[in-house]
Amino acid sequence: MPPALRPAAPSRSLLRYLRAQSEGLSFAPTCRAAAERHPALQCRHGCTAGGSTRPPRQPSSSTTTRSLSTATPPKRTQLRAGLVDLEAILPKSLRKQRTTKSLLALPPPAGSLRFSSNQSSDCDSKRPKLREWLFGNGEKKGPPDTRLNDDDIRVALEEESGSIFQRRALTAKAAMDPRLRCTEVDENGNVVMVDGELKKSELIAKYGLLPRDLRKIDSSNLPHILIRPSAILLNLLHLKVLIKHDCVLLFDVYGSKSSYPQSAFMYDLQGKLQQKQSSGANSLPYEFRALEAVLMSVTSELEADFEAVRDPVIRILSELEDDIDREKLRVLLVLSKRVSTFEQKAKLVRDAIEELLEADDDLASMYLTEKTHDLYRGEDDHTEIELLLESYNKICDEVVEEASNLVSSIRNTEEIIRAILDANRNSLMLLDLKFSVGTLGLAMGTFLASWYGMNLENFIEETNWGFAMVTSVSTVASLIVCWYGLVKLRKVQRVKMGDLHNRNAPNHWFRDESTDVLLDPSNRERLRRINSMKSAQQKRSTSKKWF
């Protein structure tokens, strides 16, 4: 949020000029009453603000002819500006302070038109002039002045005017401070806080994190495993977990799309943390048990997602072997995208674990319980955590390999379908060429017959065998042209990799010895596809023998 704008304060020279004008046009009774209430306003030689050098009158011993009534207090006069009201400029919090302290502590101004005429020369000599008020006096004598200077007034104005905007800005900033919903599990496996909201600043201060660490939890979908001096931060698939030596913090448990897997993880985590660990050498510390629960949940989720993707893919691939349909191809396209996304997700999880395994200093820093007892391990002393991470890394690697095999099966099926479609396209083109050759033969016969039908005199019309001869010659010419075209077309069609039947002959230099390999159960699908391709090729060869 941008900082609140502060209004510009009046300049120093403007304030001095306004003060001089206000004091020059003030009334004498106000200054005199102020001098009577505050003796500090009296001159050093005993003169009051009114300028009288006489000592104060003593009350007469005789009885006074008039008695003063004290029922109502005297009305308090205040200093007012003649041209500009300074109280309208000042904020409310400084008005009383100025009227009671600042204005009464000011020395009597020079140039006052309402002062009494019986002022002493000492007070006139001590009274500052208009030039001194405007430009200041270089010499400072006597005790320090207690009146407010221009800097104090300017600072007070800025603070008063900006305090409201500052309070509003701080309130808006506090309201916009992002919060994270989390569930906390203590060292005994008991849930101490369910769906609680914590500010990011509180998490940073309480658990010793950095702001960039919370950003990876809040806005990043890439798997991360961060090792900090006093915490382990994990962002793996549906889990965003903070592990300490005595507590586990799970973020966004309820209300999210993956609430069910996170709830199942909470039950598994409580079961692992509530197990009584022996004090032997093989016992795992608190943070390792929590980390194992996280990795187990992540790998289980990966396997469940893979099972949900693999079954429809295998089904649609088997259906495409029998019939290539447009709707089936569309379903295969959707499943192919889904499998590719899953493969990428599994690779990211595997890479995150492998990256942690390659960092020896991070592995040694994961012993949080020992750090609380001031025990620090060397960079090569991390056998327990390394074995734990390697076991789950192998599981992730297996899932990635199976996903890669499934993707390769989809790619092979797509290539086979593309080859079949190309073969069908070639068959259609071949049929078109055959019709073109037949049309050419008929055109040749028609061309010969057109000579006989011309309206010209020739000896053929006078004979009895003319019609039969022209018909037979046209037919023979058409057949010859068709036979020649089909022979040339068959030679063009023979441009292929060769006959598969002759390769298995005893004298052939190449022999396929991969039959035993194809009998393996993992390659049965591949063998079935090869047999179907051979049967389809045999059918096509038998249908073309009449040419």
Swiss-Prot record:
CDD domains: Mrs2_Mfm1p-like. One of its GO terms (cellular component) is mitochondrial inner membrane. It is a multi-pass membrane protein. The chain crosses the membrane at residues 428-448, 467-487. High-conductance magnesium-selective channel that mediates the influx of magnesium into the mitochondrial matrix. Essential for the splicing of mRNA group II introns in mitochondria by affecting mitochondrial magnesium concentrations, which are critical for group II intron splicing. It also suppresses a variety of mitochondrial intron mutations and its absence may disturb the assembly of mitochondrial membrane complexes. Belongs to the CorA metal ion transporter (MIT) (TC 1.A.35) family. This is Mitochondrial inner membrane magnesium transporter mrs2.
